[in-house]
Amino acid sequence: MLCKRTLSEISSLYTASKKKKTVIDTLSYTYPDVLLSCNERYQITHPELGIVHASNLYCSSLESFCLQYRDYGNDLSIRSCEKLVFSDALITGLSRIKFTPWPECRTRYETTVSELRRLHDMDNFTEASGFLEDLKRWLCSQNVFLEPFQKNCILHVICFLVATRTPHHYHYIFEYIKRLFNIENINTSVLDTFKHKTTVFLVPRRHGKTWILTPIITFLIKNFSNISVGYVAHQKHVSQHVMKEVEILCRREIPYVVENKDNVISVIRTNSRSCALFASCFNTNSIRGQSFNILLVDESNFIKKEALHAIIGFLAQSTAKIIFISSCNTSTQSTSFLAHVKKTPTQILNVISYVCEEHLYSFGERSEAITCPCYRLHKPTFISLNLNIKKTANAFLKDSFNEEILGTTNTSFLANPILTDSSVNEFDMIRYSTVNKQLQEHLADTLFVYVDPAFTTNRRASGTGVAGVGRYNNQFIVYGIEHFYLKSLADTSEDSIGECVAFMISGIIKIHPFFTMVRVLIEGNSSQAASVKIAYCIKAHLSDSACILQFYQTLDQNGFEQPFFLLKKNKRAAVEHFVSKFNSNLIKASQEIISHTIKLNFDPIEYLLLQIKNISQIVTTESVEYTTRKTKDSSDDALVAVIMAIYFCNDQEVALYKCI
């Protein structure tokens, strides 16, 4: 019998499921009856392609496509709403090819397909896929997104179980897991760390360390047969709370018999039993004599030393993995021992922090700093950090903000530049060929040009910086750089600067005919009248261009719009924006970069890098400021132009650009 409320809920859920329609598509296993005209020694049997040439094994894009759309026999086989369609060009090309039937190899192909399906029906594969499928469904029902370290923890669990329970098929199942987690391009040596027998996570407070363990434990004992999972907490009430949460979720999700007895939750099947044991460090011998496949140690930094010896003993078991999860190091040595594993030959330490190691020094020397200056690290939306929180935390306990909230370690680091070495090397080495016709189809058709004029002949002071920047999806491409010095302070100074800018724009448009719009910002802080004259000079030199030429307009003292831009407090935000994009490898240079003023024997990008490396921090009592300091070898004019061009390279203030 069902009560009226339960009956109505079941009815509504059933109706909703009937209405739900998901567009799905997977590759067919129907035998492609097509003759392959090549020597038999070069033939391979591919489950999706049939009998094909062996060279297809070395096409990574083809392999990735087949793995993505392969029919694995479960709900994770496809990505939702991805319908396969043939382009008109492909259909036309295929219609011109004549195919000859080849029924002789049907048996050979069907044998390969049956072997693949047998692999998908194998218990270990269905256990791993079932675990991931249940976890995905549960996360969707919670309407939450996983933190990166939580995904990392799940990968450590599932990859180790696959490696120990299915060593012969580990590679294939691992490729399946990589596709689900969208980590196909990660280095293999990095992925091998998931197979290590132990790993350590040091995570800041309030990041869901214990929360993610509940579904992991539940769906492990639900999907994997004869598995034993251990959970050890630093306090008994924590262990009991997690056990209750796991029991509730098990009784809701698992159709088998669920038994909770003596701090052990068991899932009883017809021919197997899976269990999860929950213990605290106050009972130091509670986990001795057990045989765990996965042992989760929560708040490991605060585990009693006597209990830790019993935990470490499981390292000798070949099929056991120990995962230490804890808050980050505090000021006392007794609760920071996990940082010692950084010295181990294997990479088992994972430190999750708001501050990267390259800039940790600034949080000890500069008390006002609260965020990492490279802007690369992820911070959840439910975490709030500001200077008031830092002062309040440190008022309660000295250095508590760094040690308890930020997730920093006690290790001291030397000062390093704000921009990382990897981002500098990538900007220098990886440059796009923007004259490539295939790439030009994806490049934005608007060129943003920033002009920072300087009216001086002193080369040690400053010159005019000019930069041309465009978009490529979420990336920025530098098309041109100029660093122009006046020969004399004559009446034609504005004409000389305007001519330099026009020549750069003309050169960019000449080799990049896809540009249809040029938007120019001329800084008018030095002289508004001179900026207006520069704008009209640029217009005169580009009068024959087919591109639409627009200038950033600002109201003057009389209320008239004039083609100049007044730089106020934008510079600090622009530098922060540049540092963030640069360290995220989102700023690239064109191989065909235009520059008429930088010496021919000097690479314009290397010239720019000399200035980029001079970006530094200035910390005041109120905030953290950035500056591009000048040196005797290089001025910062070209860099300022690039920074401002990238900052304004968007469509947010389109109405302020007008033709003159």
From Swiss-Prot:
Belongs to the herpesviridae TRM3 protein family. GO terms for biological process: chromosome organization. The keyword Iron does not apply. Keywords: DNA-binding, Host nucleus, Hydrolase, Viral genome packaging, Viral release from host cell. Its EC number is 3.1.-.-. It is an enzyme of class 3 (hydrolase). This is Tripartite terminase subunit 3. The keyword Aminoacyl-tRNA synthetase does not apply. InterPro entries: DNA_pack_C, DNA_pack_C_sf, DNA_pack_N, HSV_TRM3, P-loop_NTPase. It is found in: Host nucleus. It comes from the Viruses. A motif (Walker A motif) lies at residues 203-210. GO terms for molecular function: DNA binding; hydrolase activity. GO terms for cellular component: host cell nucleus. It comes from Elephantid herpesvirus 1 (isolate Asian elephant/Berlin/Kiba/1998) (EIHV-1). Interacts with the terminase subunits TRM1 and TRM2. Interacts with portal protein. The active site is at E299 (for atpase activity), D452 (for nuclease activity), E523 (for nuclease activity), D637 (for nuclease activity). Pfam families: DNA_pack_C, DNA_pack_N.
